[in-house]
Curated annotation (Swiss-Prot):
Subcellular location: Secreted
Alphabetical list of InterPro entries matching this protein: Conotoxin
GO cellular component: extracellular region
Tissue specificity annotation: Expressed by the venom duct.
Domain notes: The presence of a 'disulfide through disulfide knot' structurally defines this protein as a knottin. The cysteine framework is VI/VII (C-C-CC-C-C).
Signal peptide boundaries: 1-22
Disulfide bonds: 66-84, 73-88, 83-92
Record-given protein name: Conotoxin Qc6.1
Keyword terms: Cleavage on pair of basic residues, Disulfide bond, Knottin, Neurotoxin, Secreted, Signal, Toxin
Family the UniProt entry places it in: Belongs to the conotoxin O1 superfamily.
Domain of life the protein comes from: Eukaryota
GO molecular function, one term: ion channel inhibitor activity
Amino acid sequence: MKLTCMMIVALLFLTAWTFVTAVDSKNELENRGGWGQAGGWGKLFPMARDEMKNSEVSKLDNKRKCAAAGEACVIPIIGNVFCCKGYCLFVCIS
């Protein structure tokens, strides 16, 4: 019982330590709301959505690679080659 309690306390301590010592990314969203500013977290998400539409702020590559019928494809969750027309069952089926 004591060992279980010690493990739980250690896990909580390490989790808190991870969040406290985390370094902010250089690519963070500008003008994000926060606890101290008026608007709070409700202001964060609409601004984040608008900034992600801006190609200069967002460095994500949203281009989809389409495979033709009969070509190899990957399940969308795992890879980046999709069947844009039809279904993927290791190969594109129209």
